[in-house]
């Protein structure tokens, strides 16, 4: 990938559109140092290159914005990275103090295994550590059967959650990520969807703290309910000690999926998620760490957090609106009433911008209205645009009601 040279964009661009299609050019904001030379304002950004993974995604976990992608929307098998969804569904649907009994089917799962015996009982909490630290396939099935009654029903919960999170190219069949296919397709996801799931697990889920506690634990020991067998688990997510700020992650491997990984890192007020699919096959176990570090470092070096609510919006957005036919103290029948912006649903407030990027505004607003009008009447929209995509939209509404002139 070639290096790109960019001029530092200090000003926000503005596209102002009246309903009559008038245009106002952008006006730059004052620079921090107007004496800076062009060379001093020049920014050099090098994008990730030579990644091993077939699919890769770097995501801003707070906004869901994809900061870098390589075939990030191609569905592939994802092996044990599946287990982040298994864990979050379990945490949101069951009490960790429940007792889980291994079935014959759970006990028959292939390696990697806890080697629980059919009929053996464990605390659900203990099996969650087994699931995430050692990636035990039998524990995943035992958990699924306990939470939903069957693996199939649990997969239904997983797919419901995926759809809820906007993961449109994800289909889960197994709770452990083992390769499988049925009449609806094959078990798999995309790098972008996998990053969305991890972002939810660490940022939005009501059980995010428990998710982080489990996935950050270096080692964990427990026994079965009878106390006749003891078990020890060690965390195989080496990325936790590779970079400052690493907070979670899950590895995966099958012969079909190759090495896979999803991990999260938090630096100050920025949270990054990396998802990798098909990142090498034996003997290339360390490719995923190289790709993860390169993507995370790119995010740290190249992006800054911007609070959209602190940006200076176009002054034209909230200037008074002309209301004709209004009841006034004189005979003008014209009243100027205030306009304010508001949002009625949850929208992005903070977003990571690359140092060569800027937000543009698109303003659509009526020029005048006829009385009577009610407070809260929508008179336009203010859109925040990044690289041609709307990242936030606010309604412009009348602050006060205006009564019509009584001609009687």
Regions found by a protein language model. Name each.
Residues 4-26:
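Sec-dependent N-terminal signal peptides of Gram-positive bacterial secreted proteins and lipoproteins
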């Amino acid at each position: 990938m070639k290096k790109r040279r960019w001029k530092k964009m200090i000003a926000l661009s503005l596209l102002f559109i009246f309903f009559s299609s008038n245009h106002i050019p952008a006006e730059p904001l004052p620079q921090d140092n107007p004496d800076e030379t062009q060379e001093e304002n020049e920014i050099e950004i090098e994008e990730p290159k030579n990644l091993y993974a077939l699919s890769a995604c770097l995501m801003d976990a707070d906004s869901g914005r994809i900061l870098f992608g390589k075939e990030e929307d191609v569905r592939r098998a994802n092996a044990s990275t599946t287990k982040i969804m298994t864990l979050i569904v379990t945490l949101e649907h069951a009490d960790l103090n429940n007792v889980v009994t291994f079935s014959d089917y759970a006990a028959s799962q292939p390696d990697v295994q806890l080697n629980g015996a059919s009929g053996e009982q464990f605390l659900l909490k203990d099996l969650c550590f087994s699931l995430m630290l050692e990636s035990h396939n039998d524990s995943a099935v035992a958990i699924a059967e306990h939470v939903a009654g069957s693996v199939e029903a649990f997969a239904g919960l997983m797919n419901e959650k995926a759809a809820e999170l906007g993961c449109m190219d994800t289909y889960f069949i197994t709770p452990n990520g083992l390769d499988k296919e049925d009449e609806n397709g094959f078990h798999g996801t995309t790098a972008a969807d996998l990053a969305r799931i991890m972002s939810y697990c660490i940022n939005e889920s009501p059980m995010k703290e428990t998710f982080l506690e489990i996935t950050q634990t270096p080692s964990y020991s427990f026994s079965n309910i009878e106390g006749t067998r003891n078990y020890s688990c060690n965390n195989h997510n080496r990325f936790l000690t590779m970079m400052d700020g690493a907070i979670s992650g899950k590895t995966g491997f099958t012969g079909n999926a190759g090495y896979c990984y999803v991990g999260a890192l938090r630096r100050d007020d920025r949270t990054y998620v990396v998802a990798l699919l098909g990142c090498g096959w034996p003997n290339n176990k360390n490719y995923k760490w190289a790709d993860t570090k390169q993507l995370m470092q790119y995010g740290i070096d190249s992006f800054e957090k911007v609070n959209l609510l602190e940006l200076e919006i176009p002054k034209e957005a909230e200037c008074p609106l002309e209301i004709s036919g209004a009841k006034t103290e004189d005979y003008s029948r014209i009243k100027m009433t205030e306009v304010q912006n508001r949002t009625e649903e949850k929208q992005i407030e903070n977003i990571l911008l690359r140092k060569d990027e800027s937000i543009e505004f698109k303003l659509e607003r009526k020029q005048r209205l006829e009385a009577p009008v009610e407070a809260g009447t929508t008179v336009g929209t203010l859109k925040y645009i990044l690289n041609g995509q709307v990242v936030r939209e606010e309604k412009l509404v009348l602050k006060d009601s205006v009564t019509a002139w009584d001609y009687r």
